[in-house]
A protein has these predicted regions:
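N-terminal and secondary-structure boundary signal
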Residues: 2, 6, 17-152
């Protein structure tokens, strides 16, 4: 499974921290990717700069936005990137109610906001949930996820 989060390609990174104990080489400084203008072309350039092409069936997790809302990445901005990796936009229904609490309404919101015009949209918990083991987890031994995660 390979998932791409659009936030993972934006120009943010955490600084490298050295050990307070010393005694080892400092970790390599992280690469920082920066573009002055956030454009469809620059979204693709940032992705390509990672030099880690996505292979297999790829899921892009982003918010398709609440019905009538405006707090989501515009499809025109991400279309070229989403289509470059030939993938599917994925989300889960909301647990807090609202206009994306049911799969039917969620898909309508995705269509109304233009996401279904640029890529397939898969509501991960449309067919229920599945339980996946967490290997060597500190707090959890299993996680409940939308069943469609098994398709990726």
């Amino acid at each position: 499974m390979y998932m791409v989060s659009l936030l993972s390609i934006l120009p943010f990174t955490a600084p490298a921290c050295g050990s307070a104990q010393g005694g080892g080489e400092a970790p390599e400084a992280p690469k920082v990717y920066f573009v002055r203008d956030i454009t469809p072309e620059n979204m693709v350039r940032l992705y390509e700069a990672l030099e880690r092409p996505a292979t297999g069936k790829v899921a892009v997790k982003l918010s398709t936005g609440e019905p009538g809302g405006h707090n989501f990445l515009k499809p025109e901005l991400i279309k070229d990137l989403v289509q470059k990796v030939d993938d599917t936009i994925v989300e889960c229904n909301t647990a807090y109610g609202g206009g994306r609490a049911s799969t039917e309404n969620h898909l309508k919101a995705a269509a109304d906001h233009g996401f279904t015009a640029i890529a397939p949209v898969d509501i991960m918990d449309a067919d229920g949930v599945t339980t996946l083991p967490v290997k060597d987890g500190k707090w959890f031994t299993e996680m409940h996820m939308g069943k469609n995660i098994l398709n990726y």
